[in-house]
Amino acid sequence: MAKRWYVVHAYSGYEKHVMRSLIERVKLAGMEEEFGEILVPTEEVVEMRNGQKRKSERKFFPGYVLVQMEMNEGTWHLVKDTPRVMGFIGGTADKPAPITDREADAILRRVADSGDKPKPKTLFEPGETVRVIDGPFADFNGVVEEVNYEKSRIQVAVLIFGRSTPVELEFSQVEKV
């Protein structure tokens, strides 16, 4: 039987703990043959904290762990009896349904792509109001006109002397209002 990807519902905030517990339990039970990868899909994000750029991880699916496994009575019980696991997502309680290969590939591709360049933690949309927190236009409010995620820059229309003036800023220089 081929290994398929299943989504396991874990306590929110304990996804990494559940992942480590599952890996350990699989080894202790000698079931490495029935299990493949066990992972918490995350991406690296950059945020500003106290004027410093900090890298952190953001989970794609908070509260969920992806498990590649052959579904049988033994593997089902091993996962279900792991502390802080609430159960499987999809199918029925005693016969969980795997996610499609296309869904699994999309998630794995997204995880692989996220390692290339960290994304900003805050996403900006054209038309939304932001406050400039750094630079010559600090404390001005403006409307987002364009967002360039490759360069981590944002074009904001700031009202100066009663006229709308486009200003190009870095993500770290603005915050959502």
Swiss-Prot record:
GO annotation (BP), single: transcription antitermination
Residues in KOW domain copies: 126-156
GO cellular component, as recorded: cytosol
Keywords, sorted A to Z: Transcription, Transcription antitermination, Transcription regulation, Transcription termination
Pfam family, one: NusG
Family: Belongs to the NusG family.
Record-linked PANTHER family: RHO-INTERACTING TRANSCRIPTION TERMINATION FACTOR NUSG (PTHR30265), TRANSCRIPTION TERMINATION_ANTITERMINATION PROTEIN NUSG (PTHR30265:SF2)
Record function comment: Participates in transcription elongation, termination and antitermination.
Protein known as: Transcription termination/antitermination protein NusG
Native species: Pseudomonas aeruginosa (strain ATCC 15692 / DSM 22644 / CIP 104116 / JCM 14847 / LMG 12228 / 1C / PRS 101 / PAO1)
Name of the encoding gene: nusG
